[in-house]
Amino acid sequence: LVVDDCVAVASSLYGLALPTERRNAALATCDRAVTGFAAASPTYAYAYYVEALLAAERADPTVLNSALGASRALAPTEQWLAELRVKLAEDHLPQLEPTALAGHEADLALLVGSQRGIRVIARRYAAVAGFRERITAIVETLPTEQQQRFVAALRSEIAARRPAAPTP
């Protein structure tokens, strides 16, 4: 629960709307708590993700990269966590070092291979032009069946984005 509260402070509208002094104090408290949780339970991949999120908030690329890497190493196939890592990595792509970037690409491949994840990736592909080249390069390395599923999901997403035809 404490870790989820820290995510809310870092990324929710409530957290973003806090007065700067209170928000900074809450982020510092969260940073200490999450670092403590990760140290006390070194297999707690979510704590490392939140540590990466907090590092991004304070513009600390070293911790961002190492914490993203730790989260991925501990939970490489946890889709819900991969979704969180992908969003964080995409938001901070220029700060990713080669190892973190490779982990990010592995998370993207994991998501494309799953029913729920493929929709998330197709939605991002349709919405963010800068994402298309990166995900296309990854999808092209996957088995033909997964590529076809991605194209179908993408077509569905694009069709859903089209405005409805006016009724006479």
Q: What are the language-model segments listed below?
A:
Residues 27-85:
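A contiguous binding-surface segment within folded domains or other stable secondary-structure elements
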Residues 102, 106-168:
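Terminal, low-structured helical/coil segments at or just beyond the last alpha-helical repeat
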Residues 24-38, 62-72, 98-115, 136-140:
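Alpha-helical repeat scaffolds
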Residues 4-17, 26-30, 43-53, 143-154, ...:
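Charged, low-complexity, helix/coiled-coil-prone segments
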Residues 11-24, 56-63, 96:
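Short coil/turn connectors between adjacent alpha-helices in alpha-solenoid helical repeat scaffolds
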Residues 1-17, 41-54, 79-91, 117-121, ...:
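Amphipathic alpha-helical repeat scaffolds of TPR domains
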Residues 86-97, 102-103:
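Short linear, low-complexity motifs centered on an aromatic residue
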